[in-house]
């Protein structure tokens, strides 16, 4: 089972690693559509900042193999609505309203957590519409 942190059995926990558990890493605000990359996992806030509509895309497992249990937090600080969706909707499923695939949106100053629950299935929870 994924622990949510990139450690393996036998690793020694340093003070700096332990301190990292209490702080989120904030990426530079994206001003264009953004597709998640492997470095976005583990306590990352991906900021979106555009005056008009913008998209946060979740890639297929074949292109970016996030571990099941990965959480990516998305924060929309721009005035434009941010849509969270799959790069390939026929392969990756984004769920926010039960079992029906959806593309939830975030208004300005709202956030959501994208949680990988299976190979190509993500739940999106938070201040979504």
Regions found by a protein language model. Give the residues of each.
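C-terminal trimerization/auto-chaperone modules of long, extracellular attachment fibers and adhesins
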Residues: 4-6, 12-14
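Exposed extracellular interaction/assembly regions and N-terminal maturation sites
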Residues: 13-90, 120-129
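Tight coil/turn sites that cap or link beta-strands
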Residues: 61, 69, 100-111
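Hydrophobic beta-strand core residues of beta-sandwich domains
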Residues: 7, 36, 66, 104-106
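Low-complexity acidic/polar repeat-biased segments
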Residues: 104-129
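Generic beta-strand structural signal
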Residues: 8, 77, 116-117
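Extracellular beta-sheet repeat scaffolds used for adhesion and glycan interaction
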Residues: 88-102
């Amino acid at each position: 089972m994924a622990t949510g942190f990139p450690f393996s059995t036998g690793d020694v926990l340093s003070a700096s690693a332990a301190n990292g558990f209490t702080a989120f890493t904030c990426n530079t605000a994206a001003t264009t559509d953004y597709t998640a990359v492997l470095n976005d996992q583990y306590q990352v806030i991906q900021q979106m900042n555009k005056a008009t509509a913008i998209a946060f895309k979740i890639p297929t497992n074949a292109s970016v193999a996030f571990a099941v249990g990965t959480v990516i937090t998305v924060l929309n600080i721009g005035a434009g609505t941010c849509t969270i969706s799959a790069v390939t909707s026929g392969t990756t499923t984004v769920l926010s309203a039960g079992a029906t695939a959806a593309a939830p949106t975030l208004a300005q100053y709202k956030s959501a957590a994208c949680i990988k629950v299976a190979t190509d299935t993500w739940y999106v929870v938070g201040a979504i519409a």
